[in-house]
A protein has these predicted regions:
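Bulky hydrophobic segments
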Residues: 18-202, 221-348
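Divalent metal-coordination and catalytic microenvironments
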Residues: 185, 209, 215
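Alpha-helical segment that forms one wall of the substrate-binding/catalytic cleft
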Residues: 212, 216, 220-222
Length: 348
């Protein structure tokens, strides 16, 4: 029966494979998993929606300091798997080889490059944890975000074929990494602060966030299935190439065009007179958590938007039946109601 489902999935994939923007990989190339891969320690410090943003600290405006925020295809820098908290510090100090910020595309709307990179890294990490023991029950713990984050993996009989197992593990990893991104938006809304005393409500459900996260998951899945996950160096280089390619296909804008689009939606999507971290600097939010999504519609854009998707089933296996992110009571839950036992992904 499973063979029939894999055949149906294989027949469905050509449509995704012929997608001119982000084709799914059908010719699977396996690579050894990285047993000692450290987890992504923290999220990259970026970005409030808008550009040339003013800042206040401890309620006091900081004059002469602005956050530029705008990137171009030529200023992305080099991707670096986020394997230590020091990576976030380097980003803040401008010492990292990679750059993070916002970039406009005519078919994908605004893209937050930090969100793309974060979910790609989580997908790569989860794949390397899941693939060696695919089908076995297990738990993968992450640091607290209001609650204790636990990826619960369920027991099942996995496919017999090596490539089929590899493919299933990659898609499952992307699905779970996107659930982690979903929860981060919820946690920010309920008061999560990665830096104590610095509110992150400004960033919760920002209009470009989850589309960017899903883009990162899909990029990492393609990189894994193309055989570029055998080393961190190979993964990082593949991310550089894949990110530039998909942004080009989404019709990436120049710096001037991105800034002009920000100016057109000032007062509608964001308020340039507010300062970071004022919650109402961001006026437009997107609360849609789906894995099948269009970018938040941008006024004045005439190009058709590009739909990003994650399949519900791979080879007859429903991804949500194989594992989920669970949130258990934490030490500091802020405004989040305490669950009776835990919040599963179905409660998001």
């Amino acid at each position: 029966m499973r063979k029939a489902f894999w055949l149906l999935f294989a027949l469905a994939l050509p449509a995704l494979a012929q997608d001119p923007v982000l084709p799914a990989v059908t010719a699977i190339h396996t690579a050894p998993t990285l047993g000692e891969l450290p987890p992504p320690e923290s999220l990259r410090p970026c970005c409030a929606f808008g550009y040339d943003l003013h800042v206040r600290a401890a309620g006091i405006p900081i004059p002469m300091y602005q956050i530029g925020n705008v990137l171009t295809l030529g200023t992305l820098g080099k991707h670096h798997y986020n394997d230590s908290a020091f990576g976030a510090v380097k980003n803040l100090l401008g010492l990292s080889e990679e750059q993070n910020g916002l970039i406009y595309t005519r078919r994908g709307g605004f893209i937050d490059i930090a969100h793309v990179r974060d979910t790609a890294d989580n997908t790569f990490y989860l794949f390397n944890r899941i693939a060696p023991t695919l089908g076995q029950a297990g738990r993968i713990f992450y640091s607290e975000e209001l609650g204790v984050r636990r990826v619960q993996l369920n027991a099942y009989t996995p496919p017999a074929g090596v490539r089929q197992r590899y493919q299933l593990a990659a898609w499952l990893a992307g699905h779970l990494a996107f659930e982690i991104a979903q929860w981060h938006e919820i946690a920010q809304w309920y008061g999560f602060q990665s830096v104590p005393g610095f509110s992150e409500e400004i960033s919760a459900f920002s209009p470009e966030d989850l589309y960017s996260n899903l883009l990162g998951a899909r990029l990492a899945i393609n990189i894994i299935l193309s055989g570029h996950g055998g080393s961190l160096e190979d993964y990082n280089q593949a991310m550089d190439a894949a990110l530039k390619q998909v942004l080009t296909r989404l019709l990436v804008a120049t710096r001037g065009e991105t800034e002009a689009m920000f100016q057109q939606i000032d007062g509608d999507w964001w308020n340039s007179h507010r300062r970071v971290p004022d919650k109402f600097l961001v006026l437009k939010r997107n609360y849609d958590l789906q894995e099948n999504r269009l970018p938040t519609p941008v006024p004045f854009e005439t190009m058709p938007p590009y739909r990003l998707t994650m399949p519900e089933q791979v080879g007859g296996f429903r991804l949500r039946d194989l594992g989920e992110l669970q949130i258990y009571p934490g030490h500091d839950m802020q405004a989040l109601p305490v669950p009776a036992q835990y919040y599963g992904a179905g409660a998001f």
